Each structure stands twice: as structure tokens, then as C-alpha cells.
């Protein structure tokens, strides 16, 4: 089931709880929730608890990594996230601008979305998420 996310929920993920509960109430056989940005991903535990789901009822997945998402992974409500490594997304363009301006170097290509984070590897990146590096 695809659920369009209204602008108010995209802006303030805390407003998504009634929508999540209604979607799952109307479709109780859904077994996976995939969100499309960090605010919604961080809210998955809240949404799932409000819908009466335990950690084994619905697989939670999403994008980005933050301290609340680390908590969600550790609690079992979020199973996997794609860490887009936002520090690199912000840092590398500045490096590229400098290299192009100073030395005329061509553009760099860097894949910043290749890291899957789960309970198996969360301990390695959790301190970096707390510092907003990962």
C-alpha cells in the first residue's frame, strides 16, 4: 500500500501518527513500513506503538541516520536504514568548489548512499550519528 505523505507530515513528522494508524488499521496485513526521509524514519517507533505493533509485527525501514533513529534500531522498531552520510554530502561539495576554483579540477563522484545500518552494525556508527557526522 502506498501512502502519500502530506506536506504537514513532511514538515512535522509528529503529525503522521494518525495517518500511520489509519493506514495500518485499514490494511492489517501490511508487514513492512518504508519511510522516505529521516524525520519520518525517526518517528517509526512512535507510529508503530500507536498502532499497537510490537517490534516483530512490522519491519521498519527508512533513510538517514540520527540519534533518534539509532534508538529506534536499538529498540527493534527500525530494522534497517540507508545511511546517506549527510556530512559527506555537505563536505565534499565544498572541497570540490575549492579544487575547481583553485586548480581547475573536474568534478568528483562519490556514492554517499551505500551504507545499510542494522542492529548488527549500529554500534560502529552510533557515536558518529550522535555527532551528526553519520
Question: For the regions a protein language model found, what residue spans apply to each?
Answer:
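A residue-level marker of the well-folded mature domains of exported/periplasmic proteins
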Residues: 1-134
